[in-house]
């Protein structure tokens, strides 16, 4: 098993993906579509990307006391679908130009750029230029399989109870 594997492909492989990325760049926002509709669009895109020849995205893992950082290089023209992160995380774009689409909308960003992602976020990205993206999590864990179990939610939290969602968000 490749840890934190992403589904990725070169965009030039599919006209349909080009249309979806065009929609992403159009700036989908929550008021225009419900979060559920946006999640469905993300999952449909993931299914389409999975049918195409993959681009291997190999993460570099960095550890420091209480912190885990995962850095990836995304080649220009690549569309990448990440996993659902259970907890708030720090994201750093140190190189490149990328459009990021989540259930909260789409935004094109250029390095340098830093943002805190809310919990239970799944991202789709299209790299307009070669891009370096780093996600930082607060954890003392260093075992990659345990990290995946700790940090990644296999499906959108539609099936979680309100109490479980509140607990993931750090509520009482």
What feature does the model see in each segment?
Residues 128-172:
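Double-stranded beta-helix
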Residues 67-85:
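Conserved short histidine dyad/triad with adjacent acidic residue
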Residues 78, 86-87, 105, 121, ...:
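A generic "binding-loop/recognition-motif" signal
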Residues 94-95, 111, 129:
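A cytosolic small-molecule/anion-sensing beta-strand core signal
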Residues 80-82, 100-101, 117-118, 122-128, ...:
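Short beta-strand His + acidic residue motifs that chelate non-heme Fe in jelly-roll/DSBH
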Residues 85-104:
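Glycine- and acidic-residue-biased ligand/ion/polar-headgroup-sensing regions
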Residues 1-71, 165-172:
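A short, N-terminal "cap"/entry segment at the start of jelly-roll beta-barrel domains
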Residues 73, 102-123:
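Short acidic-glycine-tyrosine-enriched beta hairpin
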């Amino acid at each position: 098993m490749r840890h934190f594997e992403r589904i990725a492909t070169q965009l030039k492989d599919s006209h349909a993906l080009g249309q979806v990325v065009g929609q992403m760049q159009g700036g989908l926002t929550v008021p225009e579509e419900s979060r559920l509709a946006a999640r469905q669009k993300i999952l449909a895109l993931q299914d389409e990307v999975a049918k195409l020849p993959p681009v291997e995205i190999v993460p570099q893992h960095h550890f420091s006391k209480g912190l885990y950082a995962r850095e990836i290089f995304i080649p220009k023209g690549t569309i990448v679908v990440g996993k659902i992160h259970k907890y708030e995380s720090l994201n750093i774009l140190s190189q490149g130009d990328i459009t990021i689409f989540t259930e909260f909308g789409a935004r094109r960003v250029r390095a340098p750029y830093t943002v805190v992602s809310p919990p239970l976020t799944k991202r789709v990205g299209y790299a307009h230029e070669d891009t370096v993206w780093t996600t930082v999590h607060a954890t003392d864990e260093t075992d990659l399989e345990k990290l995946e179990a700790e940090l990644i939610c296999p499906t959108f939290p539609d099936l979680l109870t309100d109490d479980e969602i509140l607990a993931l968000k750090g509520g009482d």
